[in-house]
């Protein structure tokens, strides 16, 4: 804690407000609210905290605060400040997932549309639907039942949908406004839960058509009834009052919060939203911040009712939302809130289980590997592999694993410079010397363990370079493979003995991942180099074709195959003089012919 912070802490007021934590660059990294600023802000710099809070505090170089008249005013201000500054340590609802709605437009002849944005445009919105397929299904059904306008006002001739019976084309024909208005009212009724009335009317029409021998019409009405049943029975009923409501529940553990939101529309539970995030303040305060951001930043539709747990300040939620807020004490609504909270607890437990499993695969495996080898946990592991074909284009590659995870930005590729022919020992000697002489020279971190994809000979070479040429002491082990080219044994110690490892253990799986990764990286580099050299050799000794023109050809045609397939005119268009283009064409086609003859 610097002097500036100490001085400011002494001046903090005992009033409600917001505080803005800044890093050394003056960037706002966290925004919080407090009932008493003095107590809340000082708490960050006193006593012990969990790891994530300590990380936040370690970055604080300065802070500001804004005093407000009330706690609710502080809550509203906090949400606005978070939205404006996007602090990295705040609850940020970065998932821009929005759910689709069915919209009846506010026009002379309204249309049905699917949209993800609810605007203040005097249109009617119904939803949200769990996904766009559900919304499309419902809209297609309504298009069959009610032929609202699909065409533009400028359309003076019948559109395609008119011929399909799904558009009245009111701008091409005279349409009774009352007929159109009645259709819109029926759609509103359907989307508000009145589909049973429409089914009853269709049943009557089907019976009437059948009685009058109009069997095609009767079959059409029957299909429409089935379509309604199919669409409506896919969603589970949760309430009989058909009120749109969002149901909130939450759970906290180990400094993390999970909030679950159930979306209930026309009495149906259609979807849920799950958010898991760390929090630094009081849990109920963090929940209030979440609910404010939930509706403000993700543009969620605000329903007629919002149900919240009874330990949340209802007055604060009402200040955030212009809708009815309830804290049910009994009955079905109470069960829904409890169910949302139960699901939140389950989701949070699943997250921690996944973290534990991930740790077992990574840092846990590293610790167990260290125990098996009787060395400190090898937090940083560097692994090497050679690759060549009959000594051509020899390369080596190094991969780095930190805490059991690949650190790909630290991978390195090596072209072998001092070795002629297939000599893996000499290649390994060169690469180990190049790597660790540079580590010494530049003061880079040494690994805790070096793994060599190879047997005793290559490991001995690596150990000799480190001890006798560079004077460094780093544990070196070998990864041997079986006849199926799979990780078989870990060789370690003065006499390179087999380290006993269970084949289904996480430490063995870690070694497999490292060996597979270094092999992949080395062989990919070798193939790239071989392909590049092959390309260059095929274009060697062509009169007029220098390095620059070769490079331009590769850039233009991407491969030797494409260059060979190109005509003289295409080669000329790629920037070659006509004489050189003919030389290239003649050379490649002569070479192809001679290769076929062989």
Curated annotation (Swiss-Prot):
Annotated ranges, domain UVR: 196-231
Tell me which Gene3D superfamilies the record gives.
5' to 3' exonuclease, C-terminal subdomain, GIY-YIG endonuclease, UVR domain, UvrC, RNAse H endonuclease domain
What range(s) does the GIY-YIG domain occupy? 14-91
Q: Which GO terms describe its molecular function?
A: DNA binding; excinuclease ABC activity
What are the recorded Gene Ontology BP terms? nucleotide-excision repair; SOS response
Q: Recite the UniProt keywords alphabetically.
A: Cytoplasm, DNA damage, DNA excision, DNA repair, Excision nuclease, SOS response
The primary location reported for this protein is cytoplasm
**Subcellular location per the Swiss-Prot or TrEMBL entry:** Cytoplasm
Which Pfam family, just one, is annotated for this protein?
A: HHH_5
Q: Which SMART domains match?
A: GIYc (SM00465)
Question: What CDD domains does the record point to?
Answer: GIY-YIG_UvrC_Cho (cd10434)
| A GO CC term attached to the entry | excinuclease repair complex
Which HAMAP family is this protein grouped with? Answer: UvrC
Its subunit composition reads: Interacts with UvrB in an incision complex.
Q: What does this protein do?
A: The UvrABC repair system catalyzes the recognition and processing of DNA lesions. UvrC both incises the 5' and 3' sides of the lesion. The N-terminal half is responsible for the 3' incision and the C-terminal half is responsible for the 5' incision.
The record's similarity note reads: Belongs to the UvrC family.
- Protein name from the UniProt record: UvrABC system protein C
- What is the organism of origin for this protein? Enterococcus faecalis (strain ATCC 700802 / V583)
- This protein's gene is called uvrC
